[in-house]
């Protein structure tokens, strides 16, 4: 059973890194067509933001894969699996939008993935309550990050905005579920370290 799990997660990891993630839900569609075409500068900025969001989903896949494999209880495993499945939708949606913007994923995705996998293993090793608390805090920070992107994305980029808004809704749900399942609040130094690491990732991925 453990071997089967490892094979399954290895396959999911390969899909995350090669851009062939499966989506269980269609790409969110904007409520209305854009009033104007994006300017070249707006396309470049939108692509940078969506590349950052794509990297975040690569990291989420690695985190939740590791946390699922190290979870002690069946309920925690199921929660990480459900979150990973929805995050795989996000991964596919952001990859799709990057192609539409004539852009590409981050060149450093293997590095982001490996680092997040190690962090997920470390969180899981501390027990389910800590691991779920890490998930809840991660989702809170991602929610804040996505809200920032909603204010930064060009008003005319209704396609990207529809994707980011649905991602935000999903992240709120994941964070609440993890907290309700018994995830503990992480100490302030841990939360600050997470924000600092996220800042490095987002500022780098925007360009690379």
From Swiss-Prot:
InterPro entries: COQ7_proteobact, Ferritin-like, Ferritin-like_SF, Ubq_synth_Coq7
Biological-process GO terms, alphabetical: ubiquinone biosynthetic process
Cofactor descriptive note: Binds 2 iron ions per subunit.
Cofactor dependence: Fe cation
GO cellular component term, pick one: plasma membrane
Membrane-topology descriptor: Peripheral membrane protein
Function: Catalyzes the hydroxylation of 2-nonaprenyl-3-methyl-6-methoxy-1,4-benzoquinol during ubiquinone biosynthesis.
PANTHER family the record matches: 5-DEMETHOXYUBIQUINONE HYDROXYLASE, MITOCHONDRIAL (PTHR11237:SF4), COENZYME Q10 BIOSYNTHESIS PROTEIN 7 (PTHR11237)
Listed name of the protein: 3-demethoxyubiquinol 3-hydroxylase
Annotated source species: Burkholderia lata (strain ATCC 17760 / DSM 23089 / LMG 22485 / NCIMB 9086 / R18194 / 383)
Gene: coq7
């Amino acid at each position: 059973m453990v071997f089967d799990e490892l094979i399954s997660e290895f396959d999911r990891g390969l899909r995350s890194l090669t851009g062939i993630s499966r989506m269980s839900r269609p790409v969110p569609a904007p409520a209305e067509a854009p009033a104007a075409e994006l300017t070249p500068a707006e396309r470049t900025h939108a692509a940078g933001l969506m590349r950052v969001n794509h990297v975040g989903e690569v990291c989420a896949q690695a985190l939740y894969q590791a946390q699922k494999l190290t979870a002690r209880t069946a309920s925690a495993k199921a929660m990480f699996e459900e979150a990973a499945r929805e995050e795989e939708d996000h991964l596919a949606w952001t990859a799709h939008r990057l192609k539409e913007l004539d852009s590409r994923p981050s060149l450093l995705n293997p590095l982001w993935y490996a680092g997040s996998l190690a962090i997920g293993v470390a969180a899981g090793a501390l027990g389910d309550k800590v691991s779920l608390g890490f998930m809840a805090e991660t989702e809170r920070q991602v929610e804040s990050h996505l809200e920032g992107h909603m204010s930064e994305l060009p008003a005319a980029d209704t396609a990207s905005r529809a994707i980011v808004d649905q991602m935000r809704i999903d992240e709120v749900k994941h964070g609440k579920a993890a907290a309700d399942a018994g995830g503990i609040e992480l100490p302030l130094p841990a939360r600050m370290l997470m924000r600092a690491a996220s800042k490095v990732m987002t500022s780098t991925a925007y360009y690379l």
